[in-house]
Regions:
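Small/flexible residues
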Residues: 10-12, 18, 42
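N-terminal secretory signal peptides that target proteins for export/translocation
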Residues: 1-14
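Bacterial N-terminal signal peptides
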Residues: 17-28
Length: 330
């Protein structure tokens, strides 16, 4: 083949290659279809898809039916609980064109706060958002952020316990990586100091060191508080089995813990969290400025006493304490 023919073939190949590349690139970078572009998107972020968050989410979805219909989609992300994974999920929500970002729990909410997304963020199931600097104490809103508080003050639970049990030594099991656990720890340490109670702060992180830390509890400790943490949820059964075997009463704000063997629990309703969150989302969808929507407080708060555990631990619960209990586990 002559050189001219070779050059002609080579040039034809290059032209076809460039044309194919341009076609592929035009397809790759073209915008979404009109149907997708017109779709309204709510992006939900929850760490590790925990059972409690799934309950909140189910209530949320059910109550969005009035404003999130056929032209609306709810997209759920369940990243790992580390900061980078959560912040990447926030960025992805923005890139997908979410109109609202919904976060469950403190870790996802703090990740959204750090990212400062240009779209409104609403949260649920967060312990003391003011104390965690998610919303301001004055306006009860954050920067393009609002939601519903996910707790009742831990001081109330501690008072119920100290009114029932003579407490001289008290242990706090906390996760150093949980912002809400650190806040609860500080509050209980201050309350204990005023009452003259000695506190043993037991830090846990990885699943394997729960047993080691629990083994350090004094024989005469009068009670243990399990601080709120997205890590503790998976270890709750183990911790309660250990403490009950050692005849140590446990109090906590982890929802559902009384049914698993905790002595006293002060918890909020997952149903209400989801319902109120949907209420806020509907207001934002209708055009209201999220900065004009202060954080809501929970009204459905349950104080649960496990009398079966009390009997096993030889604890006599005063009638005054039982009279304020929302539910009793027998």
């Amino acid at each position: 083949m002559c050189l001219a023919s070779i050059d002609r073939v080579r040039g034809d190949f290059v032209w076809r290659f460039l044309l194919s590349t341009l076609i592929i690139m035009s397809c790759s970078f073209s915008g979404p279809s009109q149907a997708v572009a017109d779709e309204r998107l709510i992006a939900v972020i929850m760490a590790n898809s925990q059972p409690r968050y799934n309950q909140v989410h189910a209530a949320f979805v059910k109550n969005t039916e009035g404003f999130c219909d056929t032209d609306c989609r709810i997209y759920v992300q369940t990243p790992n609980a580390d900061t980078m994974s959560l912040r990447n999920s926030v960025r992805k929500a923005v890139a997908l064109g979410a109109e609202i970002i919904v976060t469950y729990g403190p870790l996802a909410t703090l990740a959204a706060k750090a990212e400062l997304p240009p779209v409104p963020t609403i949260f649920a199931d967060v312990y003391d958002p003011v104390g965690l600097n998610i919303v301001s104490a004055s306006t009860k809103t954050g920067r393009n952020m609002s939601g519903i508080r996910g707790d009742a003050p831990v001081q109330g639970l501690f008072k119920y316990f100290t009114d029932t049990v003579t407490v001289r030594k008290f242990a706090i099991l906390f996760d150093m990586h949980s912002p809400e656990a650190l806040l609860q720890k500080r509050i209980l340490e201050e309350s204990s100091k005023r009452k003259g109670i000695t506190v043993y702060a037991m830090e846990v992180g990885e699943a394997h060191n729960y047993f080691a830390q629990l083994g350090k509890l004094p024989d005469d400790v009068d009670g243990v508080f399990i601080a709120s943490s997205e890590q503790h949820e998976s270890q709750l059964s183990f911790v309660l089995g250990y403490t009950n075997a050692r005849k140590i009463p446990v109090i906590t704000q982890l929802a559902g813990a009384a049914d698993e063997g905790a002595f006293m629990v002060l918890e909020t309703s997952a149903q209400e969290q989801g319902e109120k969150l949907a209420e806020i989302a509907g207001q934002v969808f209708s055009g209201q400025n999220i900065n004009q929507l202060p954080m809501l407080k929970p009204h459905s708060i349950a104080f649960v006493v496990n009398l079966s555990v009390a009997k096993e631990l030889s604890i006599k619960v005063p009638i005054q304490t039982l009279s304020v209990a929302s539910r009793v586990v027998r």
